[in-house]
């Protein structure tokens, strides 16, 4: 379970450039991340995700606001104090940033050597970490001899060498195929559970958030649009930015024409979760209410072992029939309904 706050971002603002060329990358960001949790930050390209995570370890210095990590105000530290504080913050990237002339083991040992560890101690720790990421058998391989997933495992092992309390993952799976992505996400979740490391995941991919995160913040044009548990945000998005991420695909014009041709009128989005995801809603509408609805689209996903999904329905054009259908659907447990005007591509 998540513990006390370990990262506190307060009124963080980051601008680039100046004068007429000034660009606001982040505006008044307030986020608290608790010890031991996996926290996701998601948004479309240009939302400010990578800038935000780089402000956590002060790779980017905020224009205004404060960042606290493990009880230290990062924005107030001297250069020497900042170097010391960064030892407790690991970071992995989309590009693996391995030293090509060093073996996997030598890459993992590198930060230990910089910290003054003896060669013997560094190698012992390096082998231990390669075993943790299931890559001990490839300790003598060079990066060019490793697959993308194996390179990322080496990068993860290397960032764990200094025993960080926080692991920042900036699009860490974006360059990987789907199967390798799942493997790396399972590894990150295992590290979180076994070592208690707090993980911050930056991604544009909802599936990554669904797979491993406990809570999530949606960034939109440099601001936090929504924040909450993954279940809350993905099952019932409250903002337009949230809906764009959770419901990215429109209904093709052809399906809308078919809906109208079959006597359909308004289009509604039904969001359901838990056991309700498998209730025969359409059949129940027809049997219990005598109302026929057209299915224009449906999607179900698994979040934390529970089924969540959405269904786009074309209601009858007749207002009485449509009202009866809406009353029936809204009476069901754990179901939310919203009308979707002009919902098409």
Identify the role of each PLM range.
Residues 178-180:
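Helix N-cap at the start of a conserved alpha-helix in ABC-type nucleotide-binding domains
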Residues 57:
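Helix-to-loop junction immediately C-terminal to a conserved catalytic motif
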Residues 141-144, 162, 169:
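Conserved signature/switch motifs of ABC ATPase nucleotide-binding domains
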Residues 72-73, 109, 113, 120-137:
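Conserved ABC ATPase "signature" region
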Residues 102-109:
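Short coil-to-helix segment of the ABC ATPase nucleotide-binding domain corresponding to the Q-loop/switch region
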Residues 227-228, 236:
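ABC ATPase "signature
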Residues 209-211:
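A short, surface-exposed alpha-helical micro-motif characterized by mixed small hydrophobic
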């Amino acid at each position: 379970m998540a513990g006390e706050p370990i990262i506190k971002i307060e009124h963080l603002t980051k601008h680039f450039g100046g004068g007429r060329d000034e660009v606001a990358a982040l505006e008044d960001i307030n986020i608290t991340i608790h010890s031991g949790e996996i926290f996701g930050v998601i948004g479309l390209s240009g939302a400010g995700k990578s800038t935000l995570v780089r402000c956590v370890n002060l790779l980017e210095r905020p224009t205004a606001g404060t960042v606290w990590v493990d009880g230290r105000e990062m924005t107030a530290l001297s250069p020497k104090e900042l170097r010391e504080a960064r030892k407790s913050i690991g970071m992995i990237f989309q590009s693996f940033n391995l030293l090509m002339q060093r073996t996997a083991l030598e890459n993992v040992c590198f930060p230990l050597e910089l910290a003054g560890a003896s060669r013997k101690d560094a190698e012992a720790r390096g082998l231990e970490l390669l075993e943790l990421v299931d890559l001990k058998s490839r300790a003598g391989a060079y990066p060019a001899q490793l697959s993308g997933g194996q390179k990322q495992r080496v990068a993860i092992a290397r960032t764990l060498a200094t025993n960080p309390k926080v692991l920042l993952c900036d699009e860490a799976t974006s360059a990987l195929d789907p199967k390798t992505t799942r493997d790396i996400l399972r590894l990150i979740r295992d590290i979180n559970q076994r070592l208690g490391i707090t993980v911050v995941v930056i991604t544009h991919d909802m599936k990554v958030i669904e797979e491993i995160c406990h809570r999530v913040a949606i960034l939109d044009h440099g601001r936090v649009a929504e924040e909450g548990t993954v279940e809350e945000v993905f099952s019932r998005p409250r903002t337009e930015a949230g809906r764009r991420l959770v419901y990215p695909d429109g209904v093709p014009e052809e399906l809308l024409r078919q809906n109208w041709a079959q006597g359909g009128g308004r289009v509604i989005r039904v969001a359901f979760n838990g056991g309700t995801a498998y209730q025969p809603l359409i059949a129940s509408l027809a049997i219990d209410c005598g109302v026929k609805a057209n299915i224009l689209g449906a999607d179900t996903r698994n979040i934390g072992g529970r089924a969540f999904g959405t269904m786009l329905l074309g209601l009858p054009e007749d207002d009485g029939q449509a009202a009866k259908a809406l009353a029936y659907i809204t009476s069901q447990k754990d179901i939310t309904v919203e009308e979707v005007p002009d919902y098409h591509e």
